[in-house]
């Protein structure tokens, strides 16, 4: 079976606190997974590891068969879209500019269908509006739109509501 994500005995420690201990899992294509647990149980740490924002203390993981290493991190990041609790948006920029910036960060050419992405995220006709004028809900939707830039193969939602 082909797996989108393979996690092998991953552990992550912060000084005296162990956030993850020997976690292994396989996520098949098309699957939907949810991580449920108390605060501090390692859910966000696992997501940050998968996204390449942190490195594990031990163990390994691969996205679409590509081991997540320093050399492969940019390739892996282009295949992941992530929506976090507090999305990283530029308040001084318009919604369109935020999406174009994400394409630049990913090293991808700007996409002509930015209006389509905004519509998909429920932000029809907001492309020219500055994000600082958006409600919290609209900012969250903009975070979703940003995560969809580059048509990622793997979408991660970390407390998106």
State where each predicted segment sits.
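Helix-to-loop junction immediately C-terminal to a conserved catalytic motif
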Residues: 51
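Conserved ABC transporter NBD signature motif
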Residues: 59-69, 75-76
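Conserved ABC ATPase "signature" region
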Residues: 100, 104, 111-126
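Hydrophobic anchor residue at the start of the ABC signature
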Residues: 144
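Catalytic Walker B motif of ABC-type/P-loop ATPase nucleotide-binding domains
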Residues: 155-159
